[in-house]
């Protein structure tokens, strides 16, 4: 058993080195299990275990009938870790919200320098759609996309991955949170004012204005969620 454990770790280390040396890039297909086993002189069970772990951690994607591909989607394993921590009461929503706020503030600062005109225009369009839409489900999707676009426009993949992981935890455990926040016209109006000021600040490259808009945005969300929790007591 111990020998097999060392063998699958050796397979993982082999592919890790290949990736670090630039010999394997995202999108490239791994050789068949049999070829890997023969090349590394290990059992196919060890190769399968290594592939299973690399799939779980986001290094590869196993596609049935097609094979295994390098993806390096580490956000996947990060989201799974945070989801388990939330499920086991190791973290709560307030802690996730604190991280989200800090990262979105950082994302905004970076977006001032890195956001393209096209990205800013797309975020403006999302804010306008939110203003007009009366569909709760659509509003929740638009809000999620807007915050994703802000993270993406930061140009920092770690900021994007961490924020996506936070969003995944929220979607897993507080299914209707976004819809509830945007359900009343007054709340929707207040939050969308924050969105508008945020995009205006991005266009104007106004750091202070943008940070104030984000601070107000998270204050409103946390107030709403506190009310929600109090109703459960």
Which residues fall in each region the model found?
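Solvent-exposed, non-membrane alpha-helical residues enriched in polar/charged side chains
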Residues: 16, 20-21, 151, 199, ...
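Short loop-to-helix capping motifs
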Residues: 32, 155-157, 205-207
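Short linear motifs at protein or domain termini
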Residues: 1-99, 103, 109, 113
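Juxtamembrane/interface motifs at transmembrane-helix termini
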Residues: 3, 48, 115-117, 142-143, ...
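Short, charge-rich, low-complexity alpha-helical interaction segments
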Residues: 160-170
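C-terminal all-alpha effector/ligand-binding and dimerization domain
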Residues: 131, 169-233
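All-alpha effector-binding/dimerization core of bacterial HTH-type transcriptional repressors
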Residues: 73-149, 186-212
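Cytosolic histidine kinase catalytic core of two-component systems
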Residues: 118, 157-158
């Amino acid at each position: 058993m111990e020998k097999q454990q060392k063998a699958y770790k050796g397979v993982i280390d082999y592919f890790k080195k290949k990736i670090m040396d630039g010999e394997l890039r995202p999108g490239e297909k791994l050789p068949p299990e049999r070829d890997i086993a023969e090349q590394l002189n290990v059992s196919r069970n060890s190769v399968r275990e290594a592939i299973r772990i690399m799939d779980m951690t986001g290094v590869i994607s196993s596609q049935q009938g097609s094979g295994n591909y390098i993806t390096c989607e580490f956000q996947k394993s990060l989201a799974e870790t945070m989801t388990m921590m939330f499920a086991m009461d190791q973290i709560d929503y307030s802690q996730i919200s604190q991280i989200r706020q800090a990262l979105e503030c950082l994302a905004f600062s970076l977006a001032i320098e890195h956001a393209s005109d096209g990205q800013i225009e797309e975020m403006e369009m999302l804010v306008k759609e939110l203003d007009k839409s009366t569909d709760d489900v659509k509003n929740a999707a638009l809000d999620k996309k807007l915050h994703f676009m802000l993270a993406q426009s930061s140009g920092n993949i770690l900021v994007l991955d961490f924020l996506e992981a936070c969003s995944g935890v929220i979607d897993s455990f507080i299914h209707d949170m976004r819809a509830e926040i945007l359900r009343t016209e007054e709340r929707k109006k207040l939050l969308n004012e924050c969105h508008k000021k945020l995009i205006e600040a991005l266009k104007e490259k106004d750091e202070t204005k943008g940070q104030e808009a984000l601070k107000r945005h998270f204050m409103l969300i946390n107030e709403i969620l506190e009310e929600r929790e109090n109703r459960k007591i």
